[in-house]
Each structure stands twice: as structure tokens, then as C-alpha cells.
């Protein structure tokens, strides 16, 4: 009987020991599983953070590329605008020059004598030189005539009438010589010169024909 009790007691202790080992093994396996899950979760978290960082870096690169492209577009637009402005300025200058040339051509008046002109200036200063060469140096005929008429009217009658013109040459420099008749004084003329600079000067306000 004692042996039976002793055997049962030994069996109970053995089974209890086996059960404890099994529980410890289960606890160990559970800890391993928990650790593996934790490491896997940490890895996922790290991977997610890395992906976010990579995406952020990619976004920065895209934004930088967009800024660079925008800057290039703005620079190209600025260069294009500057080129267009320069071209417009050139066209405007050409247009102004063409307009000035057209005005000069349209306002050009060939030298002429007054109505029923007496040979006054031509007699005082007969010109036998190269007329075309002289006219190239002298100012526009009508402009010179108007300046001479205004100067002549400063002396005596202020309504003098254009009579005739001639050209005077001295050391390669030319002058217009104009005569203006005084309607209030029979046979009297004002003699006015205009040089190549356009300067008018009365040389004789009461020339008697």
C-alpha cells in the first residue's frame, strides 16, 4: 500500500513538473512571438517613415524642378520681352527716320525767284560755280528764305516781298543771297544772306536798284 501511494505521489510530481515545463515553454514561445511581432512592427514603422521621407525628398525635388522650370520660363519670357522691346524700339526708330526723310522730301522746295523778279541779288553776287554742290551744303531753300524774310522785315517796312536770290562762295563755304523789295519805297531792296548754318544777316537794308 505504501508503495502504491509512493508511486502515485511520484507520478503526480512528474506530471506537475512536465506541466510546469510545458507552461514555461509556452511562455517562452509567446515571448518569442511577441518579440518577433514587435520587431516586424518596428520594421514596418521604419519602412513607412523611410517611405515618407523618400516621398518628401521626391516632393522637394519635384518642387525644385518646378521652381527651376518656372525660373527658366520667366527668364525666357523676360528675354523674349526684352528682344521684342528692342525690336519695337528699332522699328520705331526706323519709322521715325523714314517719317523724317519723307517730311524732308515732301517739304523740299527747289530754289525759285519771286514774281516779276528783277536781277538784284544775281547782279550783286553773280554765281558761276557748281550749283548742286552749293545746294548740298546750304540749308533747305524755303527754310532759308523764311529766315531771311523775317530778318529783312526788322528794318523799315515789315511786309517786304521776295524778289530773287543768288549764291556766294568764299573759301569753299556757300551762302544764299536774297533780295526783298520794299513795297513802300520804289526801287529799294533789302539784301540778306543766309549761311550754311542757317544764320540770316542783313547786309544792306536799303539797296537802291
From Swiss-Prot:
UniProt keyword annotation of Zinc-finger present: no
S-diacylglycerol cysteine lipid sites: 18
Primary location group: membrane
Topology with respect to the bilayer: Lipid-anchor
GO CC annotation: plasma membrane
Compartment annotation: Cell membrane
Bias (Low complexity) ranges: 71-105
Superkingdom as given in the UniProt entry: Bacteria
Keywords associated with the record: Cell membrane, Lipoprotein, Membrane, Palmitate, Signal
Positions of region (Disordered): 17-105
Keyword Signal: yes
Positions of N-palmitoyl cysteine lipidation: 18
Segment forming the signal sequence: 1-17
Skewed-composition ranges (Basic and acidic residues): 23-70
Protein name in the entry: Uncharacterized lipoprotein SAOUHSC_02650
Native species: Staphylococcus aureus (strain NCTC 8325 / PS 47)
Organism placement in taxonomy: Bacteria, Bacillati, Bacillota, Bacilli, Bacillales
Amino acid at each position: 500500500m505504501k508503495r502504491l501511494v509512493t508511486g502515485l505521489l511520484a507520478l503526480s510530481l512528474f506530471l506537475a513538473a512536465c506541466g510546469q515545463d510545458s507552461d514555461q515553454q509556452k511562455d517562452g514561445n509567446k515571448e518569442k512571438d511577441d518579440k518577433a511581432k514587435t520587431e516586424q512592427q518596428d520594421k514596418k514603422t521604419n519602412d513607412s517613415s523611410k517611405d515618407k521621407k523618400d516621398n518628401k525628398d521626391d516632393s522637394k525635388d519635384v518642387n525644385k524642378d518646378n521652381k527651376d522650370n518656372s525660373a527658366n520660363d520667366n527668364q525666357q519670357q523676360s528675354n523674349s520681352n526684352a528682344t521684342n522691346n528692342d525690336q519695337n524700339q528699332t522699328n520705331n526708330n526706323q519709322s521715325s527716320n523714314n517719317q523724317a526723310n519723307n517730311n524732308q522730301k515732301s517739304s523740299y522746295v527747289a530754289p525759285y525767284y519771286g514774281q516779276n523778279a528783277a536781277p538784284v541779288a544775281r547782279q550783286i553776287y553773280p554765281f558761276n560755280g557748281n550749283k548742286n554742290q552749293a545746294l548740298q551744303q546750304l540749308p533747305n531753300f524755303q527754310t532759308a528764305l523764311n529766315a531771311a524774310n523775317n530778318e529783312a522785315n526788322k528794318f523799315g517796312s515789315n511786309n517786304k516781298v521776295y524778289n530773287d536770290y543768288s549764291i556766294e562762295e568764299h573759301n569753299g563755304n556757300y551762302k544764299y543771297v536774297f533780295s526783298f523789295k520794299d513795297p513802300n519805297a520804289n526801287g529799294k531792296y533789302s539784301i540778306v544772306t543766309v549761311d550754311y548754318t542757317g544764320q540770316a544777316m542783313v547786309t544792306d537794308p536799303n539797296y537802291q536798284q
